[in-house]
Amino acid sequence: MNKRFATLLVGLLGGLLPHPGYSQQGPAFSQDPEVRAFIVAMHEQHGFDIAHLTRQFASIRPNTVVLRAIRPAAVPEQQRSWQRYRERFLTSTRVDGGRAFWQRHAVDLQRAAATYGVPPEVIVAIIGVETVYGQNMGSFGVLEALASLAFQYPPRADFFRSELEQFLLLARENGVSPLSIKGSYAGAIGIPQFMPSSQRRFAVDFDGDDRIDLRNSNSDAIGSVARFLQQHGWQQGAPIAVPATVTGDPAALIAAGIKPALSVQEMAAYGVHAVADAERAAALIDLVTPGVATEYWLGFDNFYVITRYNRS
């Protein structure tokens, strides 16, 4: 199809197709010139039908809740609190739920550990943090959420446009309408909260039913979490983190970030000491709680791999 004609077709369809009210959210996405260009690109690069895709974008609008949620209030340094953060996640609901989840899915967890080298406790902890073992997978329409962030949130527009592209491909591959899929305000999907690109690249059919279903299959979720970590460099049997004592000024080490760069032995020259392999690379992590002494840990490669899953 001629590109100029394709662009014109998108424009005509965007203006003529009906769409639901929601006037507080602005015009339908199909009326946005950037969205029209995106639709043309999806047609040219992946063979999507322009009219069909335009109808889908005509039924969604910028979601102001999503746009507010992606802009969390900045937390001043003096308000950081490891204790508050810890209490938020280490609740009796998560602990009891984790124990029950582990018992119910022990076979799959052991199989994932044998296949990918990731221990059950790490997989269980991640799923507990992400969705409380599938109880809170998000209620946002993923197409609307990703479109809102792709075209209404300039700081990360490139990232979310890429995820929107991956999401449409994912929906087509699975034979489902992109309008039917629910997830987080950032477009993460299912029990393990995979972004669309991660689902296409790392998710696995771990229950052997010839389909990957991260919303309904705990087995697929378990295997996919383990494979994600393995593919990002998980080292079987290696430590994640150990407590550290600090006698010097740790500012430079903290500022260096969480990717392991110095050996434990090299850390000692900065007044950082821990019981660990002297040659193992580490990063210094500070856990700050106002009014109490800062807690320090050395994070190793496996800790960094976990942050690749979710930095928060």
What are these regions (language model features)?
Residues 1-4, 8-161, 166-182, 187, ...:
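Cell-wall glycan-active module
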Residues 193:
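Functionally critical loop-and-helix segments that line ligand-binding/catalytic clefts
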